[in-house]
Amino acid sequence: MSITQYLLKYLFILILFSGLVSNEMLADQHIKHQALQIDKEENSLSILSWNIKMHSPPYGWFYNSIDKAENIIKTLKESSKYDVILFQEAFSYKIRNKIYNSLKDLYPHQIDIKDETNFYKMNSGLWVISSIPITLIDNFNFTELRHNDWLSSKGAYLYSVIKSQQEFYIINTHMQADYRTKYSYIRTSQYTEIQQKLISPNENSEIPLILCGDLNISKPSKLNQMLEKLNFMNGPLSGKLKHTSLGNNHELLDYILVKSKKIKFQSIERRILNMSVYLNIDSIQLSDHYPIEGI
């Protein structure tokens, strides 16, 4: 055997071994993560928040929505079971119906989108399915929207769930995106509107309040302004992933926040999940966002 052949053979063995080790590490990570969830107390609440980018035709045709929906269904069947799954950009009724009908044995409850939209606008895309009973308390559409967001009915939904005799309030929202123009001031008006219409009416309540969704806020200073305004708390992220967008910028845009006064949460673990490992596919074949979980 020549030196060149020997080196090629050695390189092949090295690549094969590194691939096996990498897959074993990923599998071990998910086994440990699932075991951690099983160990959680029964009265804890498990939440998954995911921007799934499911547009109605004709826009959805360009993003392989049907194939991506099937991948999302498969991953949610393989992953840990959650009490509540909150979706953003679930604009397509056909896709929502497909996902719900495929998962209703695991998640028998849903609250479909209930927006007052104009004929030329999309709905809010804010949808929820759950393994426990869930009730819609209130919802509204933002007054201020800019650029392409003006063609949607973005807003916020307030839900109630009860687990082990403990009630929780959960807000699902999707705020203004940035385009060539940065729209931080629009997002400020939007979370102020959330405070006025959904948070303040429940200010004196002893019910724990959680805010989830795609906030489109990547700068820590801007997030801190929102947290201070609403009296909410963020927390550290477990795991290796520290961003939720799959774009070139790798930004953290999606959050699970909790009310910081009156209500004291014993603990909450946040983790950004690469769900593609369940199917051995590229993450973009699911969505352009990673989901974030809170337990």
Enumerate the language-model features and the residues they cover.
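Active-site environment of divalent metal-dependent phosphoester hydrolases
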Residues: 54-57, 92-95, 121, 177-180, ...
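Active-site beta-strand/loop signature of hydrolases that rely on acidic residues for catalysis
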Residues: 45-52, 72-99, 129, 159-160, ...
